[in-house]
Amino acid sequence: MGAVTDDEVIRKRLLIDGDGAGDDRRINLLVKSFVKWCNSGSQEEGYSQYQRMLSSLSQCEYSMGKTLLVHDMNLREMENYEKIYVDIESSIAAAHEKIAECKKQILQAKRIRKNRQEYDALAKVIEQHPDRHETLKQLEALDKELKQLSHTKENAEDKLELRRKQFHVLLSTIHELQQTLENDDKLAEESQESPMETQNP
């Protein structure tokens, strides 16, 4: 399991603290304290309301700071998701290119196989005339070319198998990354709903 980032720690702490909950109540208390302070009948009462007003104002400033912090954190996450999206698009494009290349290699392997069959048939015809020196020379040349084609075919098949394995790994990685992004989105939605459920029991 990977190390927890600072953004994740901050986000969890803000969610536990109930970010956004009670902001209206704090503002209302601040307004009421201000009205009572204006209407205070004595210096002692005015000082008491003044202290309450400062306390409410401090809470509002603290809440606003948390909100701005969450906003900045969300912006960073959006930028990160956009980068991941671009990487996925690039990986998909590369996968399509590899698929096209594999198809070309398959067609080449089929042509090699067809050529080998044709050469085998021709070799059988040549073998019917073993008494001719020129025919034997042609047969040797064809046999050499056939071996080269067979070697080329084996190399192409090995390369094609390697590309298939690489493509399978790439698709698995893309699937895991998409699953991770979906899980992150679900966790983010659940985390946003949790403070609302706490505020409205």
UniProtKB/Swiss-Prot annotation:
InterPro entries assigned to the protein according to its UniProt record, in alphabetical order: THOC7/Mft1 (IPR008501)
Location(s), subcellular: Cytoplasm; Nucleus; Nucleus speckle
Pfam families: THOC7
Biological processes per GO annotation: mRNA export from nucleus; mRNA processing; RNA splicing
Gene Ontology CC annotation, any one: THO complex part of transcription export complex
Region (Disordered): 182-201
Primary localization class, coarse: cytoplasm
Coiled coil feature spans: 75-194
GO molecular function, one term: RNA binding
Keywords, comma-separated and alphabetical: Coiled coil, Cytoplasm, mRNA processing, mRNA splicing, mRNA transport, Nucleus, RNA-binding, Transport
Function recorded in the entry: Component of the THO subcomplex of the TREX complex which is thought to couple mRNA transcription, processing and nuclear export, and which specifically associates with spliced mRNA and not with unspliced pre-mRNA. Required for efficient export of polyadenylated RNA. Plays a key structural role in the oligomerization of the THO-DDX39B complex.
Homology family: Belongs to the THOC7 family.
Subunit structure, as described in the record: Component of the THO subcomplex, which is composed of thoc1, thoc2, thoc3, thoc5, thoc6 and thoc7. Component of the transcription/export (TREX) complex at least composed of alyref/thoc4, ddx39b, sarnp/cip29, chtop and the THO subcomplex.
Protein name stated in the entry: THO complex subunit 7 homolog
